[in-house]
Amino acid sequence: MPEYRSKTSTYGRNMAGARALWRATGMKDDDFQKPIIAIANSFTQFVPGHVHLKDLGQLVAREIERLGGVAKEFNTIAVDDGIAMGHDGMLYSLPSREIIADSVEYMANAHCADALVCISNCDKITPGMLMASLRLNIPTVFVSGGPMEAGKTTLADHKLDLVDAMVLAADPHASDEEVATVERSACPTCGSCSGMFTANSMNCLTEALGLSLPGNGTVVATHSDRKQLFLNAGRTVIELCHRWYGAEDATALPRGIATFAAFENAITLDIAMGGSTNTILHLLAAAQEAEVSFTMQDIDRLSRNVPQLCKVAPNTQKYHIEDVHRAGGIFGILAELARGNLLHTDVATVHSKTLGEAIATWDIIGTQDEAVHTFYKAGSAGIPTQVAFSQSTRWPSLDTDRTEGCIRDMEHAFSKEGGLAVLYGNIAQDGCVVKTAGVDASIHVFEGSALVYESQEAAVKGILSDEVQPGMIVVIRYEGPKGGPGMQEMLYPTSYLKSKGLGKQCALFTDGRFSGGTSGLSIGHASPEAAAGGAIGLIRDGDRIRIDIPQRAINVLISEEELASRRLEQHAIGWKPAQSRTRKVSSALKAYALLATSADKGAVRNKTLL
């Protein structure tokens, strides 16, 4: 049987010094026979999704200790993409994913932890911890801080979120008072932003991967039911320790759970719920850490066969994550996918022997279990707060309408093809990504003239000064992982296009990426990126570009000979922006850029250079 990793530092006379230090943390003689379980928290007062996490690590720790383990908590960094957006702060967001993954690895391996509980929530924290858990491959459970409640105001007949505030602020017809009212109401509570943005998408995907408990992605941060998720995470990690160290059960380990089939399940869910395009980036990165050969080609294949069964903000103003929970949460969507034979139900999870067994237990349509129904009635209270577990509101009924509700069955899908698509062509030879869930059907085929910008800042200036006209395709390049560096999100350009009334009249194409809050014909992750010699760097103002989502194609309409000629010219001058940028790139960011791969590889480090 496997031995506790922690014995390396707790067993034998030669470890007397290490034990002395362990004792200084509060450990006693009996504790040296127990599993030492690391709790990776991510509390910070900078991020609304993390402001309430301060005491939650100790909540998990006390449960672990009650059940016979030793719990040791540490913290990782956490960047708020919304606060970092629109300025050079966004250069640090994606690189922070690698820092988080490394820091969890460093702490767990330096101290020989036997298992891990990951308390994550926002955009790069869940992916970073996911990468670390698959790299370490020790028993691991994820539990997130939970989604924010949606905002409300008398100025709108729909719920609000961060994007509403951004779009209204750029609308010249909106008064300062109106903007201020929406701003104050858009983000009322602690938690990750209330739509199907990147943070919530990733927390939902951990359910499909099998690494978190049901409800992890959908119980709002303020609800008392989420406390039980944290306690259950402590219980579950102890059970996983017993299964691995006591019975050598490989399905107690992250790599035994997050198999190729599980990654297919995760992206199938992602496509069905119209998740953020960033999830593709992060799943590709996580798969590499798991040593699973899961690629853009697999995503492309699945995207053609999976319908969209759930539509949530920013793809509609009608529903937010709290509404997904009322409709049965992620297991409600998984159940419909299983009924359509689109899931691998024989894969393991941290809480059930198989995903199929879990669906049978947690599907509100298939079960009569009143406890399950009560769980999914957990709702929002509409009271501004930064306190976790502070309310116990429940909906009077569940949303079980699979014809016109928040979650649909296969027959009544929002669209027969899913919410994400991979496009290929002569300006994205290794692929690019579009969230079709946010694209109006009238522009699924779009042809326009290119207007090229060498940075996000230049594009924002151009959009706000009316350089961009109907029928144009805005090209923003040298914003990839290497070229940015850091692959900035383009939420401001897309939001400003909407505020200018161009959301259905223009497209945007970039080697950068998009916030989960983005909608419209926004195509990102162009690979190879411009800084790596990608053909997006060869596009010129006025070039005609054709986008064909049904055919999964994107091409600049010039000859191969012209492209080849331009490539020779570009090689001669180097793959760098044509206009100088005032951007300050620190040595830390330069180090990231040296090793960064393009988006089709998950923007992970190029290990061949190590």
UniProtKB/Swiss-Prot annotation:
Gene3D superfamilies noted in UniProt: IlvD/EDD C-terminal domain-like (3.50.30.80)
Key word DNA damage present: no
Cellular component, GO annotation: cytosol
List of residues binding Mg(2+): D81, D123, K124, E489
Alphabetical UniProt keywords: 2Fe-2S, Amino-acid biosynthesis, Branched-chain amino acid biosynthesis, Iron, Iron-sulfur, Lyase, Magnesium, Metal-binding
Binding site for [2Fe-2S] cluster: C122, C193
Molecular function via GO: 2 iron, 2 sulfur cluster binding; dihydroxy-acid dehydratase activity; magnesium ion binding
Location of N6-carboxylysine modifications: K124
Magnesium listed as a keyword: yes
Any one Gene Ontology BP term: isoleucine biosynthetic process
Residues at the catalytic site: S515
TM stretches of this protein: none
Pathway: Amino-acid biosynthesis; L-isoleucine biosynthesis; L-isoleucine from 2-oxobutanoate: step 3/4; Amino-acid biosynthesis; L-valine biosynthesis; L-valine from pyruvate: step 3/4
Catalytic activity: (2R)-2,3-dihydroxy-3-methylbutanoate = 3-methyl-2-oxobutanoate + H2O; (2R,3R)-2,3-dihydroxy-3-methylpentanoate = (S)-3-methyl-2-oxopentanoate + H2O
EC number(s) per entry: 4.2.1.9
Xref: Pfam families: ILV_EDD_C, ILVD_EDD_N
Co-factor requirement: [2Fe-2S] cluster; Mg(2+)
Cofactor binding note from Swiss-Prot or TrEMBL: Binds 1 [2Fe-2S] cluster per subunit. This cluster acts as a Lewis acid cofactor.
Family label: Belongs to the IlvD/Edd family.
Function: Functions in the biosynthesis of branched-chain amino acids. Catalyzes the dehydration of (2R,3R)-2,3-dihydroxy-3-methylpentanoate (2,3-dihydroxy-3-methylvalerate) into 2-oxo-3-methylpentanoate (2-oxo-3-methylvalerate) and of (2R)-2,3-dihydroxy-3-methylbutanoate (2,3-dihydroxyisovalerate) into 2-oxo-3-methylbutanoate (2-oxoisovalerate), the penultimate precursor to L-isoleucine and L-valine, respectively.
Subunit relationships: Homodimer.
Protein name stated in the entry: Dihydroxy-acid dehydratase
Species annotation: Xylella fastidiosa (strain Temecula1 / ATCC 700964)
